Amino acid sequence: MVGLALLARLEERFLPEKRKVSPARRVSIIGISAAIAAVLHVLDFPLVILAPEFYKLDFSELPVLLCGFYLGPSATVICEGVKILLKLLLKGTSTAFVGDLANFVVGCSLVLPATIFYHAHKSKHSAIIGLAIGTLVMTVFGSAFNAVYLLPKFAQLYGIPLDTIIAMGTAIRGGVSNVSTFVLLCVAPLNLLKGAVVSVLTMLLYKRVARPLFGLHQ
């Protein structure tokens, strides 16, 4: 909460062109975006040609980005948090909240850089650059987060040796031999794919969706 309040203050100081909306409308936009994101999150699916099946691909950051492009970076953090809460209500957790935490923090690593850069420059070009930066940050951060926290935690959660998870990666990508190559050859491509698809959809849909959904007039 302290970090979110600080982010909001920084927005006011360094992003003066951020769109002003009433508190009620802001809550409404975040709520609608989070609800759509939660549904997309529930519809996640494995992509076993890239990573073991317990890694799921979803495009729930799309409505979060649309919300953030409209309202600003702090809205994306709130939207991500509400998305996770709604997903837990709809589907529960199968990973003792480990996967839910990962989705939140890795999602934020995409949407925060993208929306911060966009609102700092406010143009189509800056949106493209921001999304590229966000995808790169998510790929690097997601890989590091997996190596340091997520993979050991999954091994502990499922009661299996870490080497067993590495072997799952080896079965998919022959070059996987340790944690480093696992995140490089399995996790990073998955995050790159997600970032690329979400970025393209954001650019295609923002103006089309923002007008009817958010009341965008410019």
Predicted region positions:
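Loop-helix junctions at membrane interfaces
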Residues: 1-218
